[in-house]
């Protein structure tokens, strides 16, 4: 049996959790918070991990895993280098998608919306809360650019450690946060026999409305 044939045979049942129109919250942010509280109790690894998808100038989609670092006023916040590939793509096309997947609970959340930078004050506050070596790494890494080798990065990091010691570090201007302002959010609950639950929220003017989608 080939490896590809065996891959086709990999499957599992998802259990008894469910999501109905009646049990769903009226707005998706309340529903997300409700699910996320459960996730923090049940997911062992990286509960804040989310796939961020953007589109480059050629129209090619691009995805990577980033970490959710805030949910403020209904907006999803993450941080990155403003000169990275994702930042360049966002600059040209300020729309993105997020995908959360929590396998222990067989739950998935998909988000689509507009992207904009958060305030410098917010970025400063988060940057100063990071471990010191993580702050140094943000300074020395020219994210998404070709580098000679890993040793050069480590040497630059060690040099900064010697230079700064325990002194406060100023956030570099090319590093900070983005918020995704959602226009659509879908909640997916895995069910047995592949008859999954899907509740899709979308903006209707200034209000949210939701509907059930077929799996």
UniProtKB/Swiss-Prot annotation:
Q: Does the keyword Metal-binding apply?
A: no
Family, according to the entry, reads as follows: Belongs to the pyridoxamine 5'-phosphate oxidase family.
Annotated keywords: Flavoprotein, FMN, Oxidoreductase, Pyridoxine biosynthesis
Q: How is the cofactor bound?
A: Binds 1 FMN per subunit.
Protein's UniProt keywords contain Zinc: no
Q: What is this protein called?
A: Pyridoxine/pyridoxamine 5'-phosphate oxidase
Question: Which amino acid positions bind substrate, per UniProt?
Answer: 11-14, 69, 126, 130, 134, 194-196
Query: What Pfam families does UniProt report for this protein, alphabetically?
Result: PNP_phzG_C, PNPOx_N
Q: Which PROSITE patterns match?
A: PYRIDOX_OXIDASE (PS01064)
Q: Which reaction does it catalyse?
A: pyridoxamine 5'-phosphate + O2 + H2O = pyridoxal 5'-phosphate + H2O2 + NH4(+); pyridoxine 5'-phosphate + O2 = pyridoxal 5'-phosphate + H2O2
What subunit structure does UniProt give?
Homodimer.
Binding positions (FMN): 64-69, 79-80, 86, 108, 143-144, 188, 198
HAMAP family tied to this protein = PdxH
Q: Which SUPFAM superfamilies match?
A: FMN-binding split barrel (SSF50475)
UniProt-listed InterPro entries: Pyridox_Oxase (IPR000659), Pyridox_Oxase_CS (IPR019740), Pyridox_Oxase_N (IPR011576), Pyridoxamine_oxidase_dimer_C (IPR019576), Split_barrel_FMN-bd (IPR012349)
**UniProt GO BP:** pyridoxine biosynthetic process
Q: Per its UniProt entry, which superkingdom is the organism in?
A: Bacteria
Q: Name its pathway.
A: Cofactor metabolism; pyridoxal 5'-phosphate salvage; pyridoxal 5'-phosphate from pyridoxamine 5'-phosphate: step 1/1; Cofactor metabolism; pyridoxal 5'-phosphate salvage; pyridoxal 5'-phosphate from pyridoxine 5'-phosphate: step 1/1
């Amino acid at each position: 049996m080939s490896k590809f044939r065996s891959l086709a045979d990999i499957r599992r049942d998802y259990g008894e959790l469910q999501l109905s129109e009646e049990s769903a919250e009226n707005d998706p942010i309340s529903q997300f918070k409700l699910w996320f509280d459960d996730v923090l109790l049940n997911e062992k690894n990286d509960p804040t991990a989310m796939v961020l998808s953007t589109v480059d100038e050629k129209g090619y989609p691009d995805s990577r895993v980033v970490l959710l670092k805030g949910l403020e006023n209904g907006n999803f916040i993450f941080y990155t280098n403003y000169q990275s590939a994702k930042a360049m793509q966002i600059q040209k096309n300020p729309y993105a998608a997020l995908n959360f997947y929590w396998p222990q609970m067989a739950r998935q959340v998909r988000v689509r919306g507009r992207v904009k930078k958060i305030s410098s004050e917010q970025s400063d506050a988060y940057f100063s809360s990071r471990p010191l070596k993580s702050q140094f790494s943000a300074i020395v890494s020219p994210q998404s650019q070709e580098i000679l080798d890993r040793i050069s990065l480590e040497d630059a990091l060690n040099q900064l450690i010697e230079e700064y010691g325990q002194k406060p570090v100023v956030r570099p201007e090319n590093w900070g946060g983005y918020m995704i302002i959602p226009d659509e959010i879908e909640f997916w609950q895995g069910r047995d026999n592949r008859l999954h639950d899907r509740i899709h929220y979308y903006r209707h003017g200034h209000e949210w409305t939701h509907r059930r989608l077929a799996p």
